[in-house]
């Protein structure tokens, strides 16, 4: 499971939409009911707005309610430099907690659901 999270982190830091979306299931839904296409557009916009992205991820909890399903609570520290601040010291930093559900797809794991949690909640 850590390998999958690390690979997603690497793809995001490389700002590679295609590589990141490889980890997202076709039937993905977020906490607002939006699907894979909406997530792709959001990620593309985020990558355009932030010329550099650095993530720190910590898996707080992993549960396996079924052999082919994993539920994770993940904390992600995000630091980015906005495209228009390329020569400035301005950084945008946030910490978010996520509930993420993954489903086994052959030898791989794909995200089928993700929702942002309130910090500490």
Task: Give the location of each predicted region.
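A broad structural signal for short, well-ordered beta-strand segments within beta-sheet-rich domains
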Residues: 1, 50-53, 111
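Short, low-complexity N-terminal intrinsically disordered segments enriched in polar/charged residues
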Residues: 1-23
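Extracytoplasmic/periplasmic, Sec-exported soluble proteins
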Residues: 9-12, 31, 35, 90, ...
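Short, flexible helix-adjacent loops and helix caps
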Residues: 13, 25-28, 84
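Glycine-centered loop/turn positions within well-structured domains
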Residues: 18, 26, 107
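Short solvent-exposed beta->alpha transition segments
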Residues: 21-71, 75-78
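Exposed beta-sheet edge and beta->alpha loop/turn motif
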Residues: 67-121
């Amino acid at each position: 499971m850590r390998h999958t999270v690390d690979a997603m982190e690497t793809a995001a830091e490389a700002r590679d939409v295609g590589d990141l979306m490889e980890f997202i299931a076709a039937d993905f839904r977020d906490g607002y009911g939006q699907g894979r296409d909406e997530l792709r557009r959001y990620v593309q916009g985020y990558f355009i707005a932030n010329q550099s992205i650095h993530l720190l991820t910590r898996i707080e909890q992993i549960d396996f309610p079924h052999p082919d399903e994993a539920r994770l609570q993940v904390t992600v520290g995000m630091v980015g430099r906005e495209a228009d601040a390329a020569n400035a010291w301005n950084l945008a930093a946030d910490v978010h907690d996520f509930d993420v559900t993954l489903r086994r797809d052959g030898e791989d794991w794909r995200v089928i659901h993700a929702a942002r949690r309130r910090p500490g909640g």
